[in-house]
């Protein structure tokens, strides 16, 4: 079995994925890598909630998920976004299979705070055997970030943290967060490498702002001894070619690569 890469595609970038993105995934596969994709769908969920007039609110950056909101989240993530992304991958010659984190109990979840957040969960266990079976058969699993507990209750899971949990469970050699920019930018120039300390400073200095803040925080929290570096890359341009990654590499500390 070759190296396994987990790619997380945010909901806001899905409509902007370019042919270069799919070419990058193809390049990985040609190098013998296995690929797993975890996707979000925030903008689509927000639009559907508005269309259906289902009230919703955010608490500490997470969408409070009532039963009504959860029904829409499931419909959009698993019924629409997941299938669209799997279809796009197949159109580019990539053998994708769309699955929900609920399927086969792939993502076993537990509530973060039922009173404050409703059915928002965290990943308790990843049943990685399902992913290993799909990978061994040559498929690219495309996962919508829903989880299920032992009582059969479904939970809405943050896609960034779901991707980190999947990467840890399958022993991925790389985790890449796909955004609509080439990585962390300072004065328009790409920051090729960053550490936790540097990122803290870049946030304080207003270099890292808005939606990039939760991305880099998710990247930092995914770092471990088994996964010493994480990438932030663009879905609009080539991010992997001839064995080389293009984007910002995030590591825990400078000593790792000096």
From Swiss-Prot:
Main location: cytoplasm
Catalysed reactions, semicolon-separated: N-acetyl-L-glutamate + ATP = N-acetyl-L-glutamyl 5-phosphate + ADP
Lineage top rank: taxon: Bacteria
KW DNA damage (keyword) present: no
Pfam families the record matches: AA_kinase (PF00696)
Compartments in which it is found: Cytoplasm
Residues annotated for substrate binding in this entry: 41-42, 63, 156
Residues under site feature: Transition state stabilizer: 8, 215
GO molecular function: acetylglutamate kinase activity; ATP binding
UniProt pathway: Amino-acid biosynthesis; L-arginine biosynthesis; N(2)-acetyl-L-ornithine from L-glutamate: step 2/4
GO cellular component term of the entry, any: cytoplasm
EC number: 2.7.2.8
Chain's role: Catalyzes the ATP-dependent phosphorylation of N-acetyl-L-glutamate.
Family label: Belongs to the acetylglutamate kinase family. ArgB subfamily.
Entry protein name: Acetylglutamate kinase
Gene: argB
């Amino acid at each position: 079995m070759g190296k396994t890469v987990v790619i997380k595609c945010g909901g806001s970038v899905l409509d902007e994925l370019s042919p270069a993105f799919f070419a990058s995934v193809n390049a990985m596969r040609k190098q013998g890598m296995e690929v797993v994709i975890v996707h979000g769908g925030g903008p689509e969920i927000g639009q559907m909630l508005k269309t259906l007039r289902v009230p919703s609110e955010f608490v500490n950056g997470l969408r409070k998920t009532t039963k009504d909101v959860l029904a829409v989240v499931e419909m959009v993530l698993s019924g629409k976004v997941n299938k669209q992304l799997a279809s796009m991958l197949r159109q580019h010659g990539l053998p994708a299979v769309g699955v929900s984190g609920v399927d086969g109990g792939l993502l076993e979840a537990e509530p973060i705070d039922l009173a404050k957040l409703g059915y928002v969960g965290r990943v308790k266990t990843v049943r990685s055997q399902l992913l290993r079976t799909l990978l061994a058969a040559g498929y690219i699993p495309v996962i919508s970030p829903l989880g299920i507990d032992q009582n059969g209750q479904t939970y809405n899971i943050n896609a960034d943290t779901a991707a980190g949990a999947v990467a840890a469970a399958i022993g991925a050699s790389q985790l890449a967060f796909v955004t609509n920019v080439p990585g962390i930018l300072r004065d328009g120039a790409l920051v090729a490498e960053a550490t936790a300390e540097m990122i803290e400073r870049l946030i304080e200095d207003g270099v890292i702002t808005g939606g990039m803040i939760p991305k880099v925080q998710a990247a930092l929290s995914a770092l471990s001894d088994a996964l010493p570096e994480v990438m932030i890359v663009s879905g609009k341009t080539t991010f992997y070619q001839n064995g080389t990654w293009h984007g910002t590499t995030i590591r825990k500390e400078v000593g790792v690569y000096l």
